[in-house]
Amino acid sequence: MKKKPFYKVLYVQVIFAIVVGVILGHYYPSLATEMKPLGDGFIKLIKMVIGPIIFCTVVTGIAGMEDMKKVGRVGGKALLYFEIVSTFALVLGLAATHILRPGVGFNIDPATLDGKAVASYAAKAHGQSTVDFLMHIIPNTMVDAFAQGEILQILLIALLFGSVLAHLGERGKVVTDFIDGLTRVLFGIVHIVTKLAPIGAFGAMAFTIGKYGVGSLVPLLKLIGTFYLTSVVFVLVVLGAIARFTGFSIIRFVSYIKEELLIVLGTSSSEAALPQLMEKLEKAGCSRSVVGLVVPTGYSFNLDGTNIYMTMAVLFIAQATNIELTWMQQLTLLAVAMLTSKGASGVTGAGFITLAATLAVVPTIPLSGMVLILGIDRFMSECRALTNIVGNGVATVVVSAWEKELDRAKLRQALKGGGEVAATETAGV
């Protein structure tokens, strides 16, 4: 098969678009901020099909299962994996901040901080209890779940729908075949929309640099560097060890999903690459049923980048305001963060709202301390989203392997470069 010219390869186009966006934002900030609709429009186009794709993928996957106990088994294994790896991420964020101490030396008096700038985030986080979170999973109506794009609500509907179809067997085959065909159409739409990724990445990056400016990074470069370094260590060491134990290379896996990662880098939203990630994982040998259950669930329960950010940001604020936290308080922080992080989604800004929810129940640290990192949160959200999507990809491969539903020949072929061939074959859809 003839290789495409490099300038026609999607990830090359996205890299170029990001660079152009940075240049425009730096030299022409007023014009760059006008590019925001390009990024927002691309994300909206992707989010338009996320709900239907999750519904169709989960329904067809469950409907094809002979043993309905498998649904609970896969879900249980996924949640167990999420909790273990999330704990590693939270502890790593805490440990890295203790070792590198990015907040030491600021000597900020908490009384001088104006909390008005973060009041809206605090308001959104207020009152989000575990019961509220669980009740929110149940939609008011089926239509409302799709209209609002609530992933967990759609997942619940799909689980019920797929379970009934599996119980009906041949009597429900017509509906199953229709949904399977609809899935192909939806992924065809994704392929078309993905071609617009460079435009979306350009608009989002130009707006970010134009509005906040590169200069806003300088005072807090140590915190940004600590967060990015810790995230890289988490991916290479923690996820790398998990990947090697499962039988694949984390470096090759990251290379395999590079297009999705660049889309996330440009838009700061891991949701922007959700449909493409699900398709890539199926092509890499993961079964559709496991992909359909693990990936959507992971977008609320397996946010590794957000977990690292949570403990790091809280401890940074404590260091910057010279507040000493006892080990018991830090253990409480870990427990609280384990719960509050489950309410975060893949949307830009969700991590900051989750941070507000965590600080609200750790009264030792002032909520107004969030002002210290408000200006750089947008630049840290890229790293959060990148780490989240890699973590969910690895989780899906691992759970597929646990279920003995991982085609290792397909996985080896994909990680050796077979994914590029598959992507080329579907480009004309």
UniProtKB/Swiss-Prot annotation:
GO terms for molecular function: fumarate transmembrane transporter activity; malate:proton symporter activity; succinate transmembrane transporter activity. Pfam families: SDF. The chain crosses the membrane at residues 9-29, 45-65, 79-99, 149-169, 185-205, 223-243, 308-328, 356-376. Signal peptide: none annotated. Its main location: membrane. One of its GO terms (cellular component) is plasma membrane. Keywords: Cell inner membrane, Cell membrane, Membrane, Symport, Transmembrane, Transmembrane helix, Transport. It is found in: Cell inner membrane. InterPro entries: C4_dicarb_transport, Na-dicarboxylate_symporter, Na-dicarboxylate_symporter_CS, Na:dicarbo_symporter_sf. It is a multi-pass membrane protein. Responsible for the transport of dicarboxylates such as succinate, fumarate, and malate from the periplasm across the membrane. This is C4-dicarboxylate transport protein.
